[in-house]
């Protein structure tokens, strides 16, 4: 004989299940009406700008992730230099992209190749859909991520000041030009090319610069030695695997902002 408590419990679970199924069907039935509804211009401006800020904060965590990953993979003697290099890189990229990189990217004539070398100003209005300042913040984090790709490739191959010089050129010229070609409405955009979250503008651009760097700089000092007339690779012990693990999780966390907020809008039901 089935205990009475089990019978009552089964009835309760059945009611709960039916309740949640009803809620799901109600949401599905009303989703079309929600999708068609529109928010006011002021509401869209607020939520889109907030989206840029939240996404930018998440991507900023990637800077810490790159730093931890890079610090953990290099030899112990280079850890302090890597930390200083990553902090300096973040500051340099932010300043240079503010001074003229943003205008080079977004000041491109339609179908053109390069924007203007001038300091930008936030002239956004409610009708534009978002604040230019929030977009600058979000895009600046992308610049820092791009330069971080190169930073990891040339770790222990380059001194800190030459790298800072490269960071100025990368964040103020190379990256903004490639960004303007597509996201700024340049010739690639006019040709129909699309890059949703930086697979070309960020990763291919950063990867090409990193490849050029390691070809020019060569291997890390002491990485190879001669033995019996042959070139033998010397294994380098990583300074800290826990740092590598921490960096991996920080990058994983930051990527939700990097890719997710590349929608560039959260002012409508469809965007969200």
For the regions a protein language model found, what residue spans apply to each?
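Short, Lys/Arg-enriched N-terminal segments with co-localized hydrophobic residues
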Residues: 1-12
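Hydrophobic alpha-helical transmembrane bundles of multi-pass membrane proteins
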Residues: 14-272
